[in-house]
Amino acid sequence: PLYHIYKLSYRRLIRKVFSHKGSAIYIGNKIRDKYNESFGLDGKTVYLTSEIKRHPFREIPVRSPVISYFGNIRLGRNESLREIGDALGRIDSSYILNVYSNEKDEHYIGIFDGSRNVKFCGTVPYSEVMKKSAESDILIVVEGFKKKDVDITRYSLSTKVADSLSSGAAVFAYGSAECGAIEYAESIGCITTCTDKDMLEVSLRSLIYDTELQIRNYEKGITVVENNHRLENSTGIFESVVNGVCGDL
């Protein structure tokens, strides 16, 4: 009962705030469209940017690809990472998914116990994230599938997507299509995306063995990064929103 009271109070407060003339800035189109439609706004999307420098195209080395994930492993992401590791093991028993995370709780880390194909590497500073991203052949973007996790990540879009795209590595996304990051990955056309566990191994094989797919993703990724994840572009959109609001005062 308290949840519903707080939810109704929150909705009333949000509607009161948005009843005033103004605009809004969002981190993704999905939440932009929802709020603009609900509150009659003309808000703009300012995507997260990245400091990682793009490296030249590199074909994925089939015999020993460096596969990495950086970030939070809660909200079902640990389960999805374990599933990716299992699928990699079926493709080649020597393949390893390196997972870098600040997580300390064994409740979330323990799922990797006994896996020959997932290595939990612990925490690394952002400078190392940039270095290891540049060294990786495949970077993973992942979300969970359970409703309780999807409800939290439905509109989220983390820095992992911007960093992965900016690096120049091949990017593989896996999770529910209802999650913001996965929906975005699927929509931009330069990230190999899987939203069905039954297709996971097939999707990974396609990325690892199809050089033409890797090239297409790399080249399309250049355009996506330039349009969506460059600081100059994001700054320009932000300034246009602020100037528009100030001009209406």
Features from the language model and the residues they span:
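Membrane-proximal helix-turn-helix segments that form the acceptor-binding/catalytic region
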Residues: 4-24
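Conserved catalytic-core segment of nucleotide-activated headgroup transferases in glycan assembly
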Residues: 51-54, 59-111, 122-127
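Conserved active-site histidine-acidic residue motif and adjacent donor-binding/catalytic loop
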Residues: 102-106, 118-136, 144, 195
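Conserved acidic donor-binding segment of nucleotide-sugar-dependent glycosyltransferases
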Residues: 158, 176, 189-198, 206-212
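A charged, aromatic-enriched C-terminal amphipathic alpha-helix characteristic of glycosyltransferases
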Residues: 195-201, 212-243
